[in-house]
């Protein structure tokens, strides 16, 4: 295989934080990644336009003129107050995330407060990014139903750099599993990891879910050899069954701390958010997931 350089090797870690229970974990995962990569962190908080309630601006015919003018004035003042409080909350969130990361030993380059759509902000900032870090769910997600955050799918579809999806709580990353299907995306991802310091020195399991073919066995042997040549401790498993079931069980029984997988592709394991495979996997695995392009 030809060695691939990790995209934007000089870029920073960009971590998007909000008021969800994932905020602290995002900061912790970003600090871990930045330390491994030898880079700094930019923290981003977006005052999402979609989250702003509509302002009542046209009430002609519904109220007498004086009452309408009074109410419009009160609504304008309430809007201004809400905007001020949201900005202040955003600054507090960013300050808290930055302090948490610095306490963990990370270098924080910038904190960014944007009034924008999250996706637009991430795409605009991507040229300076080496790795994105987002929480699995945002502050508006339906936790009772276990839904993934509404932004996550759109972000994964749009960005071109690796994305670390933080779990609800951070714990030290000691063992890694790569969901391997022999596809070009995953093969390229392995080369990216070899070229990167992110997982260097960590033991890796190559986990294949589904039919064990001669072609797949050869691919596993080749990739395992490449990783071993790069200094990784590697083992491999080929397990029949549905990917979401096999991988979730393997993560649990082998005490895996980080799952690595390709974000897109035509095989069942990489049909991200098309059908239920990866959605079910992200919901079932209570660990961070590194998505590669």
What kind of feature is each model-predicted range?
Residues 24, 80, 84-91, 187, ...:
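Electropositive phosphate-/nucleotide-binding environments in soluble metabolic enzymes
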Residues 102-110, 228-235:
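A short helix-to-beta-strand connector/capping loop
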Residues 224, 242-252:
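A short, acidic, amphipathic alpha-helical segment used as a generic capping/interface helix at domain edges
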Residues 1-3, 9, 22-29, 35-36, ...:
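Gly/Ser-rich helix-loop-strand patches that form or flank binding pockets
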Residues 2-76, 158-161, 171-238, 256:
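Small/aliphatic-rich secondary-structure junction motif
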Residues 30, 97, 122, 193, ...:
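Aromatic/hydrophobic pocket-lining residues that form π-stacking "cages" and hydrophobic walls in ligand
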Residues 75-99, 103:
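Alpha-helix-centered segments that form part of catalytic cores
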Residues 116-119, 239-245:
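Conserved active-site histidine-acidic residue motif and adjacent donor-binding/catalytic loop
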